[in-house]
Amino acid sequence: MTPDIDRQVALETATELLPTQADLEAWVGAVLARHPDTDRHELSVRFVTADESQALNRDYRGKDKPTNVLSFPFEAPPGLPLALLGDLAICHAVVVDEAAEQGKPLAHHYAHMVIHGTLHLLGYDHIDDREAEEMEALERELLAHFAIGDPYAE
């Protein structure tokens, strides 16, 4: 299923470093291909500033700092089947800093963040060890499809 992605950019600089619409469709499409049972394929991906990320993280998670990706799954009212998956808010500054700190290409880290966030929209989590192992294994598999190495390797 081809994802329907509303790509939003809330940045005024460095927009040429952001993933393209085609990148997003490929990465999200790979996640959805592994989940053929879902008919939810519409989402928004918003590239945000550190200030917006911090405000969202504070308001929705109680953590007063910017973070790499926030996932907001859509929960349809009972009896109202919609194709909406949810929203991702990705902080460009944090992703750039993390990629540099981890010595990985920015595009690879963006792929990881989009795949990670999309898995959260589908209900995956990493609160306990078992869930984390399952989610991380799937992330590794999906990233390998794009010739991207293990993001959790030391």
Curated annotation (Swiss-Prot):
- Which cofactors must be present for this protein to function? Zn(2+)
Show which residues constitute the signal peptide.
none
**Which residues are listed for Zn(2+) binding in this entry?**
116, 120, 126
Q: How is the cofactor bound?
A: Binds 1 zinc ion.
UniProt keyword terms in alphabetical order: Cytoplasm, Endonuclease, Hydrolase, Metal-binding, Nuclease, Ribosome biogenesis, rRNA processing, Zinc
**EC number, as in UniProt:** 3.1.-.-
Q: Name one GO molecular function term.
A: metalloendopeptidase activity
Where in or outside the cell it occurs: the entry states:
Cytoplasm
Q: What biological-process GO terms show up in the record?
A: rRNA processing
One GO cellular component, as annotated: cytoplasm
Principal location: cytoplasm
Record InterPro entries? MetalPrtase_cat_dom_sf_prd (IPR023091), YbeY (IPR002036), YbeY_CS (IPR020549)
Similarity section: Belongs to the endoribonuclease YbeY family.
Role noted for this protein: Single strand-specific metallo-endoribonuclease involved in late-stage 70S ribosome quality control and in maturation of the 3' terminus of the 16S rRNA.
**PANTHER family linked:** ENDORIBONUCLEASE YBEY, CHLOROPLASTIC (PTHR46986:SF1)
Kindly provide the name given to this protein in its UniProt entry: Endoribonuclease YbeY
Q: Give the source species.
A: Chromohalobacter salexigens (strain ATCC BAA-138 / DSM 3043 / CIP 106854 / NCIMB 13768 / 1H11)
